[in-house]
Amino acid sequence: MSVLTGKELRIVGFLCNWCSYGGADTAGVARFTQPTDLRIIRVPCSGRVNPLFPLKALLSGADGVLVSGCHPRDCHYSEGNYYARRRLETLKEFLPIIGIDPRRFEYTWVSASEGQRWQAVVTAFTERVHKLGPAPKFEDAKPMYVMPNLDLPAPLRPLGCGVNPAAMTELKDQIKAALEAKEVEFVMGWQKGFDGLHATPLYMRKPEDVEKLIWGPLNVHSLATYLPLFKGKKVGIVVKGCDSRGVVELLQENLINREDVVVFGMGCNGTIDINRVLAKIGDVTEVESVTGSGATLKVRADGKDYEFAMQDVAQDKCRACTVPNAVIHDHFAGSPTNIPDGAQPAMPAIMTFLDGLSLEDRMGFWRGHIDRCIRCYACRNACPMCVCRDNCVADSREPHWLTQEDSPTQKMFFQLIHAMHLAGRCTGCGECNRACPMGIPVGALKLQMGQIGRASCRER
């Protein structure tokens, strides 16, 4: 049959020039009967098929995507098909996360002489897509605007908000010594912000600046974000455990030089989710002070006093944190924060919630929440691993990945690009979630991509 019964569907095919395209040509020369739904895009190698190509096609309305390359050990570029398989298998597992049926995507091998195999592959895939029917369009999905009140998992370790005065004094002395010895031009830390609830980055250039340094539950920023800006300069940085993972990743990618960075660490007992605190105290004009004692956070706002258990207002990442101490440091102040033996981090509440949704509801969830995105790119700017902001795909016109159209598809595609670019690189610091002014849980995409990557590594 030349065309399957019923209306033609839009199926996109990315075919390797050397093998699969030749196989399709062989099938055509031999006049093998095959469906006509497929629209072929010829590529030099399947390894050149960026996972974002199929993703964009499916998000833009394609009913199916087929990628076909050379057989294993037969690639004209030695390893292109191995790279393709690794990336595209990961993509196939990622598709259900955003509500796309993975059966709409296929990756296979066809050589130039296998005309009959090509006929069988394209016919079987087209029949499968026809059984699934036209793909649901992202923009037509029923939006799910409400974020349910999720049951937060118990923290992996006791969370606190007190500061050890002796450790703080030791940390300040270490920083002063580094500045006085001219080991660094400046040291990055935190200082009190515009009100009692907020902290801001602090650049300590002189020993007297060190007295402004604060440490505690308000130190929510990951200062590792700023390190690539100062590559080639001698700088110091104060880190929490999660921040230090960002430093390690930057070092691994040669985005900073180890000999140029002096790392100061101290045990972290958790940081607060500012939005959670504000939700609990309600509409206030000014937060005058925030202090901590043990596991209790004390907030004074508009002349009223509030008390909260630290575990009720902590960031989600702190509940599952397994690295409260800096994994890399030149100086460490105080005693390390301990984790109970045998403790295993629980699945983040948002991931448990999304795993329980159907494909249709997942698409509706992201359709509803991404609709609130204002494209401010705060998630990108806060991410320690987003280091190509000077040529970001969100702004670039060559290549022209995204338009400036205010549509849910364009907004979602940016977040998917971000998640793909962070595959294997995301440290789980949660800065994208924290920075989003609209409260969109974009970090869940990165967490689920990381989960897929770790599972793939275990299988290999």
What is the predicted role of each segment?
Residues C16-C19, V65, C70, C75, ...:
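Short cysteine clusters
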Residues K131-F138, V184, V327, C379-A382, ...:
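Intrinsically disordered or highly flexible coil/loop and linker segments, enriched in small
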Residues L55, G364-R367, D371-Y377, N381:
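Internal, well-ordered alpha-helical scaffold/interface segments
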Residues M1-W366:
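Iron-sulfur-associated redox domains of electron-transfer enzymes in respiratory
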Residues L95-I97, D341-D371, M385-R460:
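Ferredoxin-type iron-sulfur electron-transfer modules in oxidoreductases and energy-metabolism complexes
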